Amino acid sequence: MVVNKRLILILLFILNTAKSDELSWKGNDFTLYARQMPLAEVLHLLSENYDTAITISPLITATFSGKIPPGPPVDILNNLAAQYDLLTWFDGSMLYVYPASLLKHQVITFNILSTGRFIHYLRSQNILSSPGCEVKEITGTKAVEVSGVPSCLTRISQLASVLDNALIKRKDSAVSVSIYTLKYATAMDTQYQYRDQSVVVPGVVSVLREMSKTSVPTSSTNNGSPATQALPMFAADPRQNAVIVRDYAANMAGYRKLITELDQRQQMIEISVKIIDVNAGDINQLGIDWGTAVSLGGKKIAFNTGLNDGGASGFSTVISDTSNFMVRLNALEKSSQAYVLSQPSVVTLNNIQAVLDKNITFYTKLQGEKVAKLESITTGSLLRVTPRLLNDNGTQKIMLNLNIQDGQQSDTQSETDPLPEVQNSEIASQATLLAGQSLLLGGFKQGKQIHSQNKIPLLGDIPVVGHLFRNDTTQVHSVIRLFLIKASVVNNGISHG
């Protein structure tokens, strides 16, 4: 931000009230005859004669012998300084006298204040009117070099600090508006729906608003202006995918750093799901140990939880060799012992929930005394999974936080109140997978109806009497519903070393 030059002039004007005056030297002519008189005492007599306050360094221990004839006091002081190697400096109210050996150098750096204006101010105050206090600008920097006696260095440092800090305070208290364009993150909230649920993924603006809730004033005060009471303010520009911040200028550097940290490129992760029904009877014939393993195609898969004979509980396990598992599953599918119902896949960002939903909606009539309406019922397979990429000592892993809901409509059991019935199963789990591994979930037994028809060709299609030549059968088989979930990193050029 460009500092308002008028502000510098105002500050210099305020400090001008403390302007240093030159020595007035009001008094009678001074003359002295002395022998072995301490030089400090001579200087005290000179200052008293002209009614001037003086501070003399205790390191001045020389003695004076001789005569000081009447003359201009400035010449008298300069002659003594040259004769005894002294440095003098007058700050407007006090005359300081030091040995030349106490000359010190100091570099003062400014944040905002211009070095040229600072030196101009010092000269206008007569602060640099003697060799005991000099200030030079260091070319190409925002710093000055001060050469002078200790009291000069102290005074110059104080003035530099007051002026520079006043400008910083004025600059920081100014209200500023900045725009930060995002590359990877989203400024606005992202919202999507599935079934009757609404999911909101907060954008950067919502994160900033949530973070600053405790610092936002809730009401106006007598000392605060309406323009600053609601600070900070955050808004999103969807056209540029940018965050607009309105706050004090002093806070903008912090916002810039925070938004940069939030705007990081996220790895893409592909999640694929296979919904599988395995004939329970065939699995038993192949040798199922519900407590430890399922044998598919002649090879066992270990489970970490068991199934009892009632088939009311589920299991989950990690399959290390997914390709071999799929070969055995395909063999069972060819012999009609297993069925892959669907195999959807989706790509999502790291730490962003993905939803896979296959459902059917049917309606039922609800009738009251004077009103009737239709209510919808939705059921089917719903998978919600949030992947998280982990780097464990150089090994890339994917943590899955998932929830599976598996439902289907069942035939009503009541003839007097024929409302639809829905059978639901739900699994919630977490798992960490290495590359090439898959997660197998499920194990719920459910009935599956298989309709078949046997008929005599042509005769079975005759209207009215055709049913005499055909046989319709409905068989109910017990199947086990399995979910095979695989997550893999999509290579988009991001390194995770």
Curated annotation (Swiss-Prot):
GO process terms (BP): protein secretion by the type III secretion system
Keyword vocabulary terms for this entry: Cell outer membrane, Membrane, Protein transport, Signal, Translocation, Transport, Virulence
First and last residue of the signal peptide: 1-20
Main location: membrane
Protein's UniProt keywords contain Nucleus: no
GO CC annotations on file: cell outer membrane; type II protein secretion system complex; type III protein secretion system complex
Mutant phenotype after disruption: Does not survive in murine macrophages, although it can invade epithelial cells. The SpiC protein is not exported into host macrophage cells.
UniProt cross-references to Pfam families, sorted A to Z: Secretin, Secretin_N
InterPro entries: Bact_Secretion_Sys_Channel, NolW-like, NolW-like_sf, T2SS/T3SS_dom, T2SS_GspD_CS, T3SS_OM_pore_YscC
Protein location: Cell outer membrane
Self-association state and partner proteins as the record states: The core secretion machinery of the T3SS is composed of approximately 20 different proteins, including cytoplasmic components, a base, an export apparatus and a needle. This subunit is part of the base, which anchors the injectisome in the bacterial cell envelope. Forms a stable homooligomeric complex.
Role, per record: Component of the type III secretion system (T3SS), also called injectisome, which is used to inject bacterial effector proteins into eukaryotic host cells. Forms a ring-shaped multimeric structure with an apparent central pore in the outer membrane. Required for secretion of some type III-secreted effectors including the SpvB exotoxin.
Family to which this protein belongs: Belongs to the bacterial secretin family. T3SS SctC subfamily.
Record protein name field: SPI-2 type 3 secretion system secretin
Gene from which the chain derives: sctC2
